[in-house]
């Protein structure tokens, strides 16, 4: 799959098929269909969002997911103990256990993102993943919703994440479009332009 180049303030198109048919999409589809068949979507989807929040908010948890030096049985036991202590249901715990045994834990955040996109598509919504250097204010959320509506995204579910490495600005991904107005991207572009001028 070719990696798109994103220009600050611009957009790029990323293949939706690669998300739906890739490994995260296959696992997410399996979880969605299992939950739908068992009438557990109202339980599983909020818990998947809570798990994504746990991953985003805890550096140790993220490190555990990507650590390939630990024994998989130990990692699985530790993860399931954390999920049990946090009150996650049996479906999510079992799903994470399967992912762990299949040695796909590093893909768990992408799987949860794909699940979010699948659920939104089933509801007829677009998911706007917004990454900012600082948490958005209520005014910024309203302005962002308005801008997205102007761009033709009338039913948008905004999912926010904070990444201080952006330094400023936003990175917004809606469906196959990526809008990058982050200061980090602008500085990178300036750096490359200055290297080319030398």
UniProtKB/Swiss-Prot annotation:
Membrane topology according to the record? Peripheral membrane protein
Source domain of life is Bacteria
Q: Which InterPro entries does the protein's record reference? A: ATP_synth_OSCP/delta_N_sf, ATPase_OSCP/d_CS, ATPase_OSCP/dsu
Q: What is its main location?
A: membrane
GO molecular function per UniProt: proton-transporting ATP synthase activity, rotational mechanism
Q: Where in or outside the cell is it found?
A: Cell inner membrane
Per the similarity annotation, which family is this? Belongs to the ATPase delta chain family.
Keywords, alphabetical: ATP synthesis, Cell inner membrane, Cell membrane, CF(1), Hydrogen ion transport, Ion transport, Membrane, Transport
PANTHER family given for it?
ATP SYNTHASE DELTA CHAIN (PTHR11910)
Give the signal peptide, or none.
none
Q: Which Pfam families match?
A: OSCP
The record describes its quaternary structure and partners as: F-type ATPases have 2 components, F(1) - the catalytic core - and F(0) - the membrane proton channel. F(1) has five subunits: alpha(3), beta(3), gamma(1), delta(1), epsilon(1). F(0) has three main subunits: a(1), b(2) and c(10-14). The alpha and beta chains form an alternating ring which encloses part of the gamma chain. F(1) is attached to F(0) by a central stalk formed by the gamma and epsilon chains, while a peripheral stalk is formed by the delta and b chains.
Which PROSITE patterns did the record assign?
ATPASE_DELTA
- Specify the protein name: ATP synthase subunit delta
Gene Ontology cellular-component terms listed: plasma membrane; proton-transporting ATP synthase complex
Q: What does this protein do?
A: F(1)F(0) ATP synthase produces ATP from ADP in the presence of a proton or sodium gradient. F-type ATPases consist of two structural domains, F(1) containing the extramembraneous catalytic core and F(0) containing the membrane proton channel, linked together by a central stalk and a peripheral stalk. During catalysis, ATP synthesis in the catalytic domain of F(1) is coupled via a rotary mechanism of the central stalk subunits to proton translocation. This protein is part of the stalk that links CF(0) to CF(1). It either transmits conformational changes from CF(0) to CF(1) or is implicated in proton conduction.
Q: Which organism is it from?
A: Gluconacetobacter diazotrophicus (strain ATCC 49037 / DSM 5601 / CCUG 37298 / CIP 103539 / LMG 7603 / PAl5)
